[in-house]
């Protein structure tokens, strides 16, 4: 996010998602079945990826998007992730310690203040769009398991 307007638009999306969740204990499937797909598929550009990540994904654009659906899913499954951490995604991407390639998805790990995070980026088949599909805290055991299974792009 490069300016206040972009920040405010993302904060509005985040706050709307949070208010939807505060009123219930539903799973993401509930929202997918009961809300208009055009609303859930709405997205926000959150950051430009480093060129080598975009190239690895065979992406035609460095733009990374986050859909309302993915944000809701992450807020339900990983409530420990704060708004502030979402704002740090650009920093996290550019300072990732490990980047692993799993099929069409990148598994990216980074450590900040002794906390290990993982996020997954997936792009469309035509390479025109990139989406952040998950973002959560993880542990060294999971990182080591994934290092053993997937192609390592960066360390």
Kindly give the residue locations of the regions a language model identified.
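Ribonuclease/tRNase effector modules and their secretory precursors
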Residues: 1-155
């Amino acid at each position: 996010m490069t300016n206040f307007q972009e920040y405010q638009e993302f904060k509005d999306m985040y706050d709307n998602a949070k208010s939807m969740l505060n009123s219930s204990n539903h799973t993401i499937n509930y929202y997918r079945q009961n809300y208009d797909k055009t609303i859930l598929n709405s997205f926000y550009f959150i950051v430009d990826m480093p060129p080598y990540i975009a190239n690895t994904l065979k992406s035609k654009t460095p733009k990374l998007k986050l859909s309302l659906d993915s944000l809701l899913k992450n807020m339900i499954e990983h409530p420990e992730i704060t708004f502030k951490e979402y704002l740090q995604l650009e920093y996290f991407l550019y300072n990732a310690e490990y980047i692993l390639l799993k099929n069409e998805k990148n598994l990216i790990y980074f450590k900040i203040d002794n906390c290990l995070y993982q996020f997954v980026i997936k792009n469309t088949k035509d390479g025109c769009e990139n989406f952040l599909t998950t973002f959560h805290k993880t542990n060294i055991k999971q990182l080591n398991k994934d290092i053993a299974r997937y192609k390592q792009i960066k360390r």
